[in-house]
Amino acid sequence: MKLTCVMIVAVLFLTAWTFVTADDSRYGLKDLFPKERHEMKNPEASKLNQREACYNAGSFCGIHPGLCCSEFCILWCITFVDSG
C-alpha cells in the first residue's frame, strides 16, 4: 500500500515537473515543424552539417569519432591513404 502511494506521488510529481520546466508547452510543436521543413529544403542550413573544428590525423580524440576530420578515431585520429 505504501509503495503504491509512493509510486502515484512520484508519477504526479514527474508529470507536473515536465509541464513546469517546458519552455512553451502549448505551441512548442507548432514552431518546431516549419524549422525542420526549412532544413529539409536547404540541407546547408542544418547546424548538424556544419563542423566548427575538427582534429587532424594524430590528434587525441578519445572515443569520439565526430571530433576527427576523417571520422576515424581509435584514441587518436586516423586517416587512411589510398596507394593507387
Swiss-Prot record:
Disulfide bridges in this chain: 54-69, 61-73, 68-77
Pro-piece positions: 23-51
One GO CC term on file: extracellular region
Keyword Disulfide bond tagged: yes
Positions where 4-hydroxyproline occurs in the chain: 65
Statement: the UniProt record of this protein carries the keyword Disulfide bond: yes
Residue positions, PTM Serine amide: 83
GO MF assignments: sodium channel inhibitor activity; toxin activity
Pfam hit, one: Conotoxin
Subcellular localization(s) per the UniProt record: Secreted
Alphabetical UniProt keywords: Amidation, Disulfide bond, Hydroxylation, Ion channel impairing toxin, Knottin, Neurotoxin, Presynaptic neurotoxin, Secreted, Signal, Toxin, Voltage-gated sodium channel impairing toxin
Signal peptide (UniProt feature, chain positions): 1-22
Main location (coarse class): secreted
Function statement: Delta-conotoxins bind to site 6 of voltage-gated sodium channels (Nav) and inhibit the inactivation process.
Domain notes: The presence of a 'disulfide through disulfide knot' structurally defines this protein as a knottin. The cysteine framework is VI/VII (C-C-CC-C-C).
Entry's family note: Belongs to the conotoxin O1 superfamily.
Protein name: Delta-conotoxin-like MVIB
Species whose genome carries this gene: Conus magus
Organism lineage: Eukaryota, Metazoa, Spiralia, Lophotrochozoa, Mollusca
